[in-house]
Structures are given as structure tokens and as C-alpha cells.
Amino acid sequence: MLYYDEIFCSIQGESTDTGLPCVFIRLFECPIGCSYCDQPQKKEDRKRISVGNIVQTVLKEYKWCKNICLTGGEPLIYDEALPLVYELQSLGFKVSIETSGCVPLEEPCYRRSYKYVMDIKGPSSGVKHKNIYENLLKLQNTDEVKYVIKDREDYEFMKGVMKKYPTSAKILVSPMFDPDGKAYIGHELVDWILEDHLDVRVQIQLHKILEVK
């Protein structure tokens, strides 16, 4: 059994799938505690559900949508997370897993057909000590790594990690936004990236700009 918050359909607001219709399976509980978390969860909101019931819900309500994102919370704290992914893939869905980067990934003994979108937490998150950097070495070129940047310290930290732990995964860079929806850093971030010739993708949270779930 898993605990979850909700299952809903919207557009993907982040990653290289930005703008595509997507079914989100939001699992409950995250052991990380980032300072900028935009999905705080209340224990009273959690609900139990089986892998089978999740699959039935997706097939009944969202069969037309072929993109599924397993998110949270932290999906990988559940032993049932990957069996759920395999079941959804067997039905023809394209699945991505959003993970904090603070839970060990499985060993890359074969080429995965699902995608990880993995965070690396910077200094402003307050939890960078929880990063498992070895996860970066387990990623494929179909995976993605996301950094949230508030200031120069976060940016320099990102550069250091990229140099020490080179990965074939795509690198996504997001400016951090304050509670009023204003970016802490804007053109400066772009200037730094261009000056340093970094092969990264700058992204923003499209769903927040469009004011959709």
C-alpha cells in the first residue's frame, strides 16, 4: 500500500516535457524539508491506496493522456513505486519520477525506459547535506537533474557539483521564487550561465504562471 494526496491531470510545468498534458500521481510524505517547498503536506490529508487502485483510476479517468508523473512528497520511499511504474508502462504510458535526490537510486544494471527528474539541493534549501551525489552517476541521458537557484552561492555550488560529478543527464536550472511569485534572481542567472558557457536549460514553473494546478 501507498499513501497519496491526489491524482489529477494538468500540464507538466517543469522538465523537458513542459507544456504537455500529464497525469500526476502525488504520493504522500517527504523526509527532506526544503526551505522553498511548494507542496507542503498535512498528515490528515493522506489516503491509502494500492498499486492496482491507482492503475484503475488512471485507466478510468485519464486513459487518453499518455504522460504520467510520479511525484510527491518523495515517491522513492515506497517499495511499491517502481512496481507501479512498471505496471503503467506495460499499459503504454510514458512515466517520469520526480525525486529529491536524497534517496538512493537503483543500480543501473539495464537501460531504463522511465525517466528520473532529480533535484540536487543547494545551500538555500537548507538541506544540501542530504544530497546523495552518487545518484548522479546512475543517471542516463534520458534523465534530468534540476537545480533551484536563489543567489550566487547556489549557482557556484551547482557549478562545483557539475564539475565533480559529471552526468549524461540533462541539466535544468530554475530561479527560485519568493512567496509573492517574484524571482529572487533573473537576468543575472542567465548572464552567469552564458559567461561560463554552461550546457544547461533554464526553466520556470509554467503551471504557476498560467495559474493551473
Map each language-model feature to its residues.
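A broad, structure-centric signal for solvent-exposed, well-ordered loop/edge residues
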Residues: I11-E14, T18, C34, E44, ...
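A secondary-structure boundary/capping signal
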Residues: R26, T71-G72, Q205
